[in-house]
């Protein structure tokens, strides 16, 4: 997050990787520059609307509540038009309601943007609620792989995360 920039500028920066104008075009503000800037502004506003951030478009990003900052980070990532979206502990610091909203948002993103999502997360409710396939690590080593249902009943996973006494 670029905390000192506005919400819309945070998203526009990500779209800038797709512009074709050069520095000279930007300095003289020629037609190519102006039309591309208008285009990325409109695209950024569309993403902000999707993530319910359009009313905060001109607010400084650091002034947003934590949950909205997370949504802004995801919107900015989607502006790069990825094929794979990496979400590293997106629920960290969120309250249960924000986590529930995040779960719904991740499901919607996967469907609407037709992309793969790599989720690294400790909130098992979120993991079980959005993942089709789960890889479980213990001390950096893979100990299990499978569907949420398979992982939920995997004795090795239960032992590693809840303790051996839970199994016995």
Positions of PLM-derived features:
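Glycine-rich phosphate-binding loops of nucleotide-dependent enzymes
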Residues: 1-168
């Amino acid at each position: 997050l670029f905390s000192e920039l506005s919400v819309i500028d945070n998203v526009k920066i990500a779209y800038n990787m797709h512009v074709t104008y050069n520095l000279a075009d930007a300095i003289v503000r020629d037609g190519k520059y102006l039309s591309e800037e208008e285009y990325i502004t409109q695209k950024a506003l569309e993403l902000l609307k999707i993530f319910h951030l359009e009313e905060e478009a001109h607010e400084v990003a650091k002034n947003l509540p934590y949950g909205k900052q997370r949504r802004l980070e995801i919107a900015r990532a989607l502006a790069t038009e990825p094929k794979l979206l990496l979400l590293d502990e997106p629920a960290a610091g969120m309250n249960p309601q924000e986590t529930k909203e995040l779960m719904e948002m991740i499901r919607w993103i996967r469907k609407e943007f037709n992309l793969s999502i790599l989720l690294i997360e400790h909130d098992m409710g979120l993991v079980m609620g959005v993942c089709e396939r789960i890889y479980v690590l213990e001390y950096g080593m893979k100990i299990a792989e499978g569907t949420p249902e398979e992982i939920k009943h995997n004795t090795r996973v239960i032992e590693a995360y809840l303790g051996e006494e839970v199994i016995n």
